[in-house]
Curated annotation (Swiss-Prot):
GO MF assignments: rRNA binding; structural constituent of ribosome; tRNA binding
Protein name: Large ribosomal subunit protein uL1
Subunit: Part of the 50S ribosomal subunit.
Native source species: Finegoldia magna (strain ATCC 29328 / DSM 20472 / WAL 2508) (Peptostreptococcus magnus)
CDD domains: Ribosomal_L1
GO cellular component: large ribosomal subunit
Family according to the record: Belongs to the universal ribosomal protein uL1 family.
InterPro entries to which the protein is assigned, alphabetical: Ribosom_uL1_bac-type (IPR005878), Ribosomal_uL1 (IPR002143), Ribosomal_uL1-like (IPR023674), Ribosomal_uL1/biogenesis (IPR028364), Ribosomal_uL1_3-a/b-sand (IPR016095)
Annotated keywords: Repressor, Ribonucleoprotein, Ribosomal protein, RNA-binding, rRNA-binding, Translation regulation, tRNA-binding
Length: 233
């Protein structure tokens, strides 16, 4: 643990915590401060000027990042018959119906990153909602994961589709790549995500929309990013 702490402290010295960096500078720093022996993920954290307790101020959407996330997303699909066959052909990792729901319910199995369901299967999926919901795995029409077009849904997820949504603290947390992507690809992913978040601004949101932005690698320190470079508020 002491060794990890030393690396973190060394990385932290490279960052001025009083500065909100330009995107290219922040992306360069997040690569330089990643000292772990594994390929660290990079996450963006955006604090928004909304009140997500109100339904009309919840910010939520999806985007296929230009360079993906660098993670092989495991996809579970709840479907029957022809749609189940389509899901298998499209590259779904797990396909089932009541049997899949039962495995989750009885064994507590959650060996996937995203769940997709056809609309007719939501009655079955609903029974395990209290297991899937807290893990952020519940299929949702707004996220494009409740659909008859299972082929497109699976391909988009595998290509790097991510969902962004405000949590109870009005913060969005999204993976935007791996350190191995390099600064340019990380910056391009962040820019694409920020444009999507800006477009999703609720009409009822008043005042400053993007309150703060931070990016960090898995084991690295947080790096502040100037939100004004993405759009004038």
């Amino acid at each position: 643990m002491a060794k990890k702490g030393k690396k973190y402290q060394e990385s932290a010295k490279l960052i001025d915590r009083t500065v909100e960096y330009k995107l290219d500078e922040a992306s360069k720093l997040v690569v330089e401060t990643a000292k772990a022996k594994f390929d660290e993920s990079v996450e963006l954290h955006a604090k928004l000027g909304v009140d997500s307790r109100h339904a009309d101020q919840q910010v939520r959407g999806t985007i296929v990042l230009p360079h993906g996330t660098g993670k092989d997303q495991k996809v579970a699909v709840f479907a029957k018959g022809e749609k189940a066959e389509e899901a298998k052909a499209a590259g779904a990792d797990f396909v089932g119906a009541e049997d899949l729901a039962e495995k989750i319910q009885k064994e507590g199995w959650l060996g996937f990153d995203v769940a997709v369901a056809t609309p007719d299967m939501m009655g079955v999926v609903g029974r395990i909602g209290r297991i899937l919901g807290p893990q952020g795995l519940m299929p949702n029409p707004k996220a494009g994961t409740v659909t008859m077009d299972v082929t497109s849904a699976i391909k988009e997820i595998k290509a790097g589709k991510v969902e962004y949504r405000t949590d109870k603290s009005n913060i969005i947390h999204v993976p935007v790549g791996k350190v191995s992507f390099g600064e340019e690809k990380i910056a391009e992913n962040i820019n694409a995500l920020m444009q999507a978040i800006l477009k999703a601004k609720p009409a009822s949101s008043k005042g400053k929309y993007i309150r703060s932005l931070t990016i960090a690698s898995t084991m690295g320190p947080g790096i502040k990013v100037n939100p004004l470079q993405f759009a004038k508020e």
